[in-house]
Amino acid sequence: WRLGVRVSSMNYSLVSDDYAGLDAKGPIQSAGVFLQVPWLRTARDRVRFDANLTTNRYKHELNAVTYSRYTSDLLSMGWVASTMNLLPGSNQTSMDLMLSRGRINLSDSTAEHREADAATLQTEGTFSKLKFGLAHRQFFTRQTSLLASVRGQWADKNLDGSE
């Protein structure tokens, strides 16, 4: 099994000419812990259970004025699996399924941002989401392969863009 901690901090700014007049920028901090527990591990097949707890802090400025300041907390649990054919012309199939429960807290944001959210997207509060993925890679030669994949997510309400 593997237990870990992750921390990141970055600053963003919008550089497109379409948004230059906004001077949009801000810092984003993220911290979390994760646990990965192998369930099955053979030469061909691998299955593991993943659990993640993450908190994010966002601050968005428009024209040097703070427009929004909010947090996002997320607990995710799920399964990651893969299988591989070990013969020549081999292939690999992988899948993942993660169930998450989270919370967006806008209480430190401006009144304008909270009111706009309440009148439109309504992202504040708790949410649940299910993320899934399935991929298959077929190898033809050492240098040539074909990859087909599908990924998606379902949520019980509108999500913040960070989710």
Regions found by a protein language model. Give the residues of each.
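C-terminal outer-membrane beta-barrel translocator/porin domains of Gram-negative envelope proteins
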Residues: 59-163
